[in-house]
Amino acid sequence: MPDLLTVADLETQFRTREGLIHAVNGVSFSLKEGETLGIVGESGCGKSVTVMSMLRLIPSPPGKVVAGQAIYQGKDLLKISDEEIRQIRGAKISMIFQDPMTSLNPVLTIGRQLEEPLMLHMGMTQRQARDRAAQLLSMVGIPNARERLSDYPHQFSGGMRQRVMIAMALSCNPQILIADEPTTALDVTIQAQIVELVKRLRDELGMAIIWITHDLGIIAGLADRVSVMYGGYIIEEAPVKELYANPLHPYTIGLLGSLPKITEDGQRKLSSIEGLPPILFQKPKACPFAPRCSYSVEPCWQQNPTLEEVSPGHRVACWVDVRGGRQRS
């Protein structure tokens, strides 16, 4: 199956008073039709900046995409005209943002905010857009959908606001849905409801999903493949079951080791990754994880490893074979 989206060698920088921040450094990934790709990592690793760069949503200044490609349907999203990218954003590639509390306009009704993209991208009349908006709210599980179109965001709970955001993202039947930590501000019960809702809609509508999160528990039950980011780089990528069963990068091992397990003794201390994430004012020449890594060897401090395929579909950027206990050649 051909790739629906291919991102290659993406680099994004931010110019600040303190210096140049290298936020995304040569990130590459692909997405197939109907596939769910999870992008995981600590806060500040470049997850959100990667997809915002791809959709040209990085504020400029201070941000700038300095290299790379994002090929969708034969077009490079980074090079097409402003008008062309506007026709794709929201219609073909849609996005759910992190915080449902602030992502909706507080002075416009929910109906107005749902109807505008339908009239803009789908060419609907106001009556048609109103009917479609009510259908969308019903589809995401909001009762009394037509009546609630007249309500304002503050009249909805956090979970219901996130459902509205999902309805808005799905309004134009996108091929790709990008979910940027959509459950971060919600309690665990509502998180589970939102994840199940997205899974159901994915299966019904056949769309591809990029799900960005720091929560490996959510990704386990949602994604087909996982890319792990650290310091602006993808450092491991694998099918989800393979990654959880056989993590090969010390950072991935640390992330998985920090998860609480229901089958273990409740008195066990959770493991943690010592140290702090890298400061990105300088693009690292060595492995960015080396200062925090208990497996590090001499090459780790001299050269940044590239992603290499170690088994079908499983790529890792590490100088050490952590399972074999030896240095990679």
Where do the PLM segments sit?
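Short catalytic/signature loops enriched in Gly
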Residues: D3, P143-E147, E237-S329
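P-loop NTP-binding/switch modules centered on Walker-like glycine-rich loops
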Residues: E42, I178, P182, L186-R268
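Short helical segment in ABC ATPase nucleotide-binding domains corresponding to the A-loop/adjacent helical element
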Residues: V51, L55, I71, M101, ...
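Conserved ABC ATPase signature
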Residues: D151-F156, M160
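A short, proline-enriched helix->beta-strand linker immediately N-terminal to the Walker B motif
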Residues: S171-Q175
